[in-house]
Amino acid sequence: MLIIETLPLLRQQIRRLRMEGKRVALVPTMGNLHDGHMKLVDEAKARADVVVVSIFVNPMQFDRPEDLARYPRTLQEDCEKLNKRKVDLVFAPSVKEIYPNGTETHTYVDVPGLSTMLEGASRPGHFRGVSTIVSKLFNLVQPDIACFGEKDFQQLALIRKMVADMGFDIEIVGVPIMRAKDGLALSSRNGYLTAEQRKIAPGLYKVLSSIADKLQAGERDLDEIITIAGQELNEKGFRADDIQIRDADTLLEVSENSKRAVILVAAWLGDARLIDNKIVELV
């Protein structure tokens, strides 16, 4: 497995792979890898000849400096996991390598609408940072496909739109959420939970599933469903942050024409902001 930290060396390797006619898959990550990331890697390996994993804690997508400062950096352990998975290339640049003049004056990519709605409304600048770094990685790696987890549902929708709008010739693959046996969606942020909070955490998925059951049973008073769900989360020890029921294909309000709904839930548990989602067929 090759570990590359600079843009010139990355470009050199990508040129070689292209000359050899290899099909390249990219898995963008911020490191602190868990089994959910490994599922992305496995999907990439099944679809391509060469797998490139990027590990970069992107300062542009953090709306709170304290979150950036405490985000776990576990590069050595991450590389050991990826080596066992027989990943071909790890791109692990420094912030200086990606943003040589800092983030404030760096050119950015913004996806109107999707960047500022829902999760974007409570995290100003977050999705602009995501679309900027992902587009830069697409330009550098020039992958045939790129794999992203469906846990970050809005992020995946944003990347799909960016790819369509910008004309990137890249297949975007959404990989289903990987869960612990108790239902908790795997996330790097789960590492912020205390042992006691970890016992409470599966309650998020239980509330999510309860909302899904109501929708599948034909209930359509969305405001009431959301209010009750928020109360249930708070009773379980969470601090409900945002609960939305949206059209799964547009992320707009559910209408009588909606065929699928996506339930998006975000809640604080101690210092960890946990998110999850579930798609429900409405027809």
UniProtKB/Swiss-Prot annotation:
GO terms for molecular function: ATP binding; pantoate-beta-alanine ligase activity. The active site is at H37. ATP binds at residues 30-37, 149-152, 186-189. Pfam families: Pantoate_ligase. (R)-pantoate binds at Q61, Q155. Its EC number is 6.3.2.1. Its main location: cytoplasm. It comes from the Bacteria. It is an enzyme of class 6 (ligase). The keyword Nucleotidyltransferase does not apply. InterPro entries: Cyt_trans-like, Pantoate_ligase, Pantoate_ligase_C, Rossmann-like_a/b/a_fold. Pathway: Cofactor biosynthesis; (R)-pantothenate biosynthesis; (R)-pantothenate from (R)-pantoate and beta-alanine: step 1/1. GO terms for biological process: pantothenate biosynthetic process. The keyword Hydrolase does not apply. Keywords: ATP-binding, Cytoplasm, Ligase, Nucleotide-binding, Pantothenate biosynthesis. It catalyses: (R)-pantoate + beta-alanine + ATP = (R)-pantothenate + AMP + diphosphate + H(+). Beta-alanine binds at Q61. Catalyzes the condensation of pantoate with beta-alanine in an ATP-dependent reaction via a pantoyl-adenylate intermediate. Belongs to the pantothenate synthetase family. PANTHER family: CYTIDYLATE KINASE/PANTOATE-BETA-ALANINE LIGASE, PANTOATE--BETA-ALANINE LIGASE. The reaction proceeds by a bi uni uni bi ping pong mechanism. This is Pantothenate synthetase. The gene is panC.
